[in-house]
Amino acid sequence: ASAINATAVATAAEVATGYITSTSAAGTNITFPTGTLLGAELQATAGTVLDLVVDNTGGASVVTMVVGTNAIVSDAGTTTAASFGDLTIASGVTGMAKFTLLFSSATAYTITRTA
């Protein structure tokens, strides 16, 4: 797991762990890494899938995931934005989210919230 407790761009290595925690008392924006950097970290090809859990149960404010370069919210996330496209994670006992990252090439991926 990697801890990100202040607004930042997540590194490809942090996202590749599959588990990010945040315990910040302030609202925190975490930007997904570029498709190029994350693709290189994972040695991704079209069809590579990574599940990422963001754990904000120890935080006191929301975490907002921000789409980075060469990443887009998936079609499911766009058409059903309130669930599959929700990039905000509450704090406290309900503060868990799971995102599925699906690569369309070695340098580009889509993001879907799956839990």
Label for each model-derived stretch:
Residues A1-L87, F103-A115:
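Exposed extracellular interaction/assembly regions and N-terminal maturation sites
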